[in-house]
Amino acid sequence: MISVGQYSKLKVSKKVDFGYYLEDNFGDEVLLPNSAAKGHEIKEGDQLEVFIYRDSKDRMISTLKKPLLTVGEIGYLEVVSQNNIGAFVNFGLERDLFVPLKEQSYKLKEGKKYLFYMYVDKTDRLAATTRIHSYLDIAEEGKYKVSDEVNAIVYEINENATLNVAIDGEYRGLILANEHFEYIYPGQEIKGRVKRIYEDGTIGVTTRKKRLEARSELSETILNYLKENGGFMPYNDKSSPEDIKREFNTSKNYFKMTLGGLMREKLITQDKEGTRLL
């Protein structure tokens, strides 16, 4: 049986002006257009592995080109257009992949990339959804360990600001609200490290740098700020957490510890107005 969204190994049954007809063991045929066979020498009787999809006229056709994902897989794809019924994303073939409006769990933007799961809808057409959570795997025991560096892509932001992320594009992970500081949006790629592994196998990730590295970077940031502003800044260890996060993108606790370290090194002093460079 020839199925949309999958690879099939088919035999070339005949050549026509506009392409080749391929058939399976049951005699079912599908067209391989000339445009989808460019660069390949093909003759009758050849066995070809082709991807099956529907063209703009809704006809089932095949191609030797490799799509970015097949049915049942998750891919990181770019949105190429959006209208009042849905969006279209590039999955590597001539025809773009449709994402119905009801399958968009957040607003998609043209030119941005997001994670999508591809499926076949009730009309036997290819479609995609941003609702990928149930299709992500749980990492097997031992695949990741605490402190491992990982690549993550955000696919959901919860009301408490916890981020659901896909680790390496296929495993379930999360980043708690206190483990990230910057504004993060769906589809964003993040580099982090494993902080813990939950009982259900979900990977807990942090974007925080290791303490010494983070404090060293923050010290440099504070000193540069002071040098660029005449040796003074209107922030000290009494400043509000909101002001500190807005200006230095860090927590008040880290800010206070870093100021304390700079004072011990006799590089700065604090007063009620702020902090001064020595």
Residues covered by each model-derived region:
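Single-stranded RNA-binding regions, centering on S1/OB-family and related RNA-binding modules
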Residues: 1-278
